[in-house]
Protein backbone atom coordinates (compact mmCIF):
# COMPACT_ATOMS: atom_id res chain seq x y z
CA UNK A 1 0.00 0.00 0.00
CA UNK A 2 1.23 3.46 -0.81
CA UNK A 3 0.25 7.10 -0.78
CA UNK A 4 -0.22 7.86 2.93
CA UNK A 5 -2.81 6.67 5.40
CA UNK A 6 -6.42 7.54 5.95
CA UNK A 7 -9.39 6.13 7.81
CA UNK A 8 -10.56 2.65 8.66
CA UNK A 9 -11.09 -0.23 6.24
CA UNK A 10 -12.86 -3.49 7.03
CA UNK A 11 -12.29 -6.88 5.43
CA UNK A 12 -15.00 -9.53 5.52
CA UNK A 13 -13.75 -13.01 4.53
CA UNK A 14 -16.90 -14.71 3.26
CA UNK A 15 -15.61 -17.44 0.96
CA UNK A 16 -16.25 -20.43 3.22
CA UNK A 17 -18.55 -23.27 2.25
CA UNK A 18 -20.48 -23.37 5.51
CA UNK A 19 -20.65 -27.19 5.56
CA UNK A 20 -21.43 -27.31 9.28
CA UNK A 21 -24.43 -25.05 8.74
CA UNK A 22 -25.80 -27.39 6.04
CA UNK A 23 -27.92 -24.59 4.59
CA UNK A 24 -27.48 -25.54 0.92
CA UNK A 25 -25.59 -22.31 0.10
CA UNK A 26 -22.28 -20.82 1.25
CA UNK A 27 -22.87 -19.59 4.78
CA UNK A 28 -22.40 -15.90 4.00
CA UNK A 29 -25.24 -16.11 1.46
CA UNK A 30 -27.76 -17.65 3.82
CA UNK A 31 -30.93 -15.54 3.99
CA UNK A 32 -31.62 -14.50 7.57
CA UNK A 33 -35.09 -12.94 7.68
CA UNK A 34 -34.74 -11.41 4.22
CA UNK A 35 -31.07 -10.41 4.26
CA UNK A 36 -27.97 -12.52 3.71
CA UNK A 37 -25.48 -12.88 6.53
CA UNK A 38 -22.88 -10.96 4.55
CA UNK A 39 -25.30 -8.07 4.00
CA UNK A 40 -25.99 -7.86 7.71
CA UNK A 41 -22.30 -8.05 8.58
CA UNK A 42 -21.34 -5.30 6.11
CA UNK A 43 -24.19 -3.01 7.11
CA UNK A 44 -23.36 -3.41 10.79
CA UNK A 45 -19.84 -2.23 10.05
CA UNK A 46 -21.01 0.76 8.03
CA UNK A 47 -23.73 1.71 10.50
CA UNK A 48 -21.03 2.14 13.15
CA UNK A 49 -20.02 5.35 11.41
CA UNK A 50 -16.32 4.61 11.93
CA UNK A 51 -15.67 2.36 8.90
CA UNK A 52 -14.90 4.06 5.60
CA UNK A 53 -14.31 1.14 3.23
CA UNK A 54 -15.34 -2.53 3.17
CA UNK A 55 -13.79 -5.30 1.07
CA UNK A 56 -15.57 -8.67 0.96
CA UNK A 57 -13.91 -11.89 -0.22
CA UNK A 58 -16.46 -14.37 -1.57
CA UNK A 59 -16.35 -17.70 -3.42
CA UNK A 60 -15.05 -17.06 -6.97
CA UNK A 61 -18.33 -18.24 -8.49
CA UNK A 62 -20.33 -15.83 -6.30
CA UNK A 63 -18.65 -12.51 -7.13
CA UNK A 64 -21.41 -11.31 -9.46
CA UNK A 65 -24.08 -12.27 -6.94
CA UNK A 66 -22.22 -10.46 -4.16
CA UNK A 67 -21.96 -7.31 -6.27
CA UNK A 68 -25.72 -7.38 -6.83
CA UNK A 69 -26.42 -7.92 -3.14
CA UNK A 70 -24.02 -5.33 -1.76
CA UNK A 71 -24.01 -2.77 -4.56
CA UNK A 72 -21.74 0.15 -3.71
CA UNK A 73 -21.48 -0.76 -0.04
CA UNK A 74 -18.40 -2.94 -0.58
CA UNK A 75 -15.65 -3.92 -2.98
CA UNK A 76 -15.90 -7.59 -3.94
CA UNK A 77 -12.90 -9.86 -4.51
CA UNK A 78 -12.61 -13.58 -5.20
CA UNK A 79 -11.64 -15.40 -2.02
CA UNK A 80 -8.94 -18.01 -1.68
CA UNK A 81 -8.73 -21.62 -0.60
CA UNK A 82 -8.80 -20.70 3.10
CA UNK A 83 -9.49 -17.74 5.36
CA UNK A 84 -5.88 -16.55 5.43
CA UNK A 85 -5.67 -16.44 1.64
CA UNK A 86 -9.02 -14.62 1.41
CA UNK A 87 -7.89 -11.91 3.82
CA UNK A 88 -4.58 -11.62 1.97
CA UNK A 89 -6.42 -11.06 -1.33
CA UNK A 90 -8.64 -8.44 0.29
CA UNK A 91 -5.58 -6.65 1.66
CA UNK A 92 -4.15 -6.57 -1.85
CA UNK A 93 -7.38 -5.01 -3.13
CA UNK A 94 -7.02 -2.19 -0.61
CA UNK A 95 -3.70 -1.21 -2.20
CA UNK A 96 -5.56 0.28 -5.17
CA UNK A 97 -6.50 3.34 -3.11
CA UNK A 98 -5.20 5.34 -0.17
CA UNK A 99 -3.87 3.07 2.54
CA UNK A 100 -6.13 3.03 5.61
CA UNK A 101 -4.61 3.72 9.00
CA UNK A 102 -6.43 0.72 10.48
CA UNK A 103 -7.91 -2.51 9.15
CA UNK A 104 -10.69 -4.50 10.79
CA UNK A 105 -11.23 -8.17 9.91
CA UNK A 106 -14.77 -9.38 10.54
CA UNK A 107 -16.49 -12.75 10.12
CA UNK A 108 -19.60 -12.66 7.93
CA UNK A 109 -20.95 -15.35 10.27
CA UNK A 110 -21.04 -12.79 13.10
CA UNK A 111 -23.77 -11.00 11.22
CA UNK A 112 -25.58 -9.53 14.23
CA UNK A 113 -22.57 -7.77 15.75
CA UNK A 114 -23.79 -4.44 17.16
CA UNK A 115 -22.29 -1.29 15.59
CA UNK A 116 -21.42 -0.09 19.11
CA UNK A 117 -18.88 -2.91 19.40
CA UNK A 118 -17.18 -1.70 16.21
CA UNK A 119 -17.00 1.81 17.68
CA UNK A 120 -15.39 0.53 20.90
CA UNK A 121 -12.81 -1.37 18.90
CA UNK A 122 -11.84 1.60 16.72
CA UNK A 123 -11.69 3.88 19.76
CA UNK A 124 -9.07 1.53 21.24
CA UNK A 125 -7.07 1.58 18.01
CA UNK A 126 -7.16 5.37 17.88
CA UNK A 127 -6.04 5.45 21.52
CA UNK A 128 -2.73 3.94 20.41
CA UNK A 129 -3.16 0.16 20.50
CA UNK A 130 -1.94 -1.57 17.33
CA UNK A 131 -4.05 -4.72 17.76
CA UNK A 132 -7.41 -5.03 19.52
CA UNK A 133 -9.86 -7.94 19.75
CA UNK A 134 -13.30 -8.15 21.40
CA UNK A 135 -13.67 -10.82 24.05
CA UNK A 136 -16.20 -12.32 26.43
CA UNK A 137 -15.49 -14.11 29.72
CA UNK A 138 -15.99 -17.87 29.71
CA UNK A 139 -18.86 -19.36 31.67
CA UNK A 140 -18.04 -23.06 31.13
CA UNK A 141 -15.23 -24.95 32.82
CA UNK A 142 -12.46 -25.73 30.30
CA UNK A 143 -10.45 -28.96 30.22
CA UNK A 144 -7.17 -29.62 28.40
CA UNK A 145 -7.42 -33.08 26.80
CA UNK A 146 -4.84 -35.24 25.01
CA UNK A 147 -5.29 -37.24 21.80
CA UNK A 148 -6.56 -40.23 23.79
CA UNK A 149 -9.32 -38.29 25.50
CA UNK A 150 -7.52 -38.06 28.83
CA UNK A 151 -7.89 -34.83 30.78
CA UNK A 152 -4.51 -33.16 31.28
CA UNK A 153 -5.67 -30.32 33.46
CA UNK A 154 -8.16 -27.55 34.12
CA UNK A 155 -6.97 -24.07 33.07
CA UNK A 156 -7.89 -21.23 35.39
CA UNK A 157 -11.04 -19.78 33.83
CA UNK A 158 -10.46 -16.27 35.18
CA UNK A 159 -7.58 -15.75 32.76
CA UNK A 160 -9.34 -17.11 29.66
CA UNK A 161 -11.54 -15.27 27.18
CA UNK A 162 -13.61 -16.21 24.13
CA UNK A 163 -12.54 -14.07 21.17
CA UNK A 164 -14.95 -12.48 18.69
CA UNK A 165 -14.70 -10.24 15.64
CA UNK A 166 -14.19 -7.68 14.24
CA UNK A 167 -10.52 -7.73 15.15
CA UNK A 168 -8.69 -4.46 14.55
CA UNK A 169 -5.08 -3.71 13.64
CA UNK A 170 -2.81 -0.98 12.44
CA UNK A 171 -2.41 -1.58 8.72
CA UNK A 172 1.36 -1.86 8.98
CA UNK A 173 1.18 -4.55 11.66
CA UNK A 174 -1.44 -6.64 9.85
CA UNK A 175 0.50 -6.49 6.58
CA UNK A 176 3.68 -7.55 8.37
CA UNK A 177 1.84 -10.45 9.99
CA UNK A 178 0.53 -11.67 6.65
CA UNK A 179 3.93 -11.37 5.00
CA UNK A 180 5.30 -13.75 7.62
CA UNK A 181 2.30 -16.09 7.84
CA UNK A 182 3.98 -18.90 5.90
CA UNK A 183 2.12 -22.21 5.81
CA UNK A 184 1.25 -22.40 9.51
CA UNK A 185 -2.44 -22.70 10.38
CA UNK A 186 -3.93 -19.75 12.26
CA UNK A 187 -7.55 -19.60 13.39
CA UNK A 188 -7.75 -15.82 13.57
CA UNK A 189 -5.83 -12.71 12.59
CA UNK A 190 -4.76 -11.92 16.14
CA UNK A 191 -2.87 -15.23 16.13
CA UNK A 192 -0.88 -14.09 13.10
CA UNK A 193 -0.07 -10.83 14.85
CA UNK A 194 1.04 -12.70 17.97
CA UNK A 195 3.24 -14.86 15.73
CA UNK A 196 5.26 -11.79 14.66
CA UNK A 197 5.54 -10.45 18.21
CA UNK A 198 2.63 -8.02 18.17
CA UNK A 199 0.91 -7.17 21.44
CA UNK A 200 -2.84 -7.72 21.30
CA UNK A 201 -5.20 -5.84 23.62
CA UNK A 202 -8.80 -6.71 24.40
CA UNK A 203 -12.03 -4.75 24.50
CA UNK A 204 -15.40 -5.85 25.86
CA UNK A 205 -17.26 -7.99 23.32
CA UNK A 206 -20.99 -8.50 22.97
CA UNK A 207 -23.16 -11.66 23.18
CA UNK A 208 -24.85 -10.61 19.91
CA UNK A 209 -21.53 -10.98 18.11
CA UNK A 210 -21.90 -14.77 18.31
CA UNK A 211 -20.75 -16.84 15.35
CA UNK A 212 -23.49 -18.52 13.32
CA UNK A 213 -21.98 -21.96 12.73
CA UNK A 214 -24.67 -24.61 13.16
CA UNK A 215 -28.44 -25.05 13.08
CA UNK A 216 -28.86 -24.10 16.73
CA UNK A 217 -27.03 -20.83 16.05
CA UNK A 218 -29.43 -20.21 13.17
CA UNK A 219 -32.44 -20.67 15.42
CA UNK A 220 -30.99 -18.14 17.84
CA UNK A 221 -30.21 -15.67 15.05
CA UNK A 222 -33.75 -15.86 13.67
CA UNK A 223 -35.16 -15.34 17.16
CA UNK A 224 -32.94 -12.29 17.73
CA UNK A 225 -33.89 -10.66 14.43
CA UNK A 226 -37.59 -11.31 14.98
CA UNK A 227 -37.31 -9.80 18.44
Swiss-Prot record:
HAMAP family: IspD. Belongs to the IspD/TarI cytidylyltransferase family. IspD subfamily. The record marks 20, 27 as: Transition state stabilizer. Gene3D superfamilies: Spore Coat Polysaccharide Biosynthesis Protein SpsA, Chain A. Disulfide bonds: none annotated. This is 2-C-methyl-D-erythritol 4-phosphate cytidylyltransferase. The record marks 157, 211 as: Positions MEP for the nucleophilic attack. GO terms for biological process: isopentenyl diphosphate biosynthetic process, methylerythritol 4-phosphate pathway.
Amino acid sequence: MAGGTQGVAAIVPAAGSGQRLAAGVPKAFYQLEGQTLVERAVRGLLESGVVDTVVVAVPPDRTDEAKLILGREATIVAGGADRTESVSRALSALSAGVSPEFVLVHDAARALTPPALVVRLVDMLRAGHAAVVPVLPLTDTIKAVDANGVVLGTPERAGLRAVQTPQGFSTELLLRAYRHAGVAAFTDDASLVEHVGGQVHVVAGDPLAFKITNRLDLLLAHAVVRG
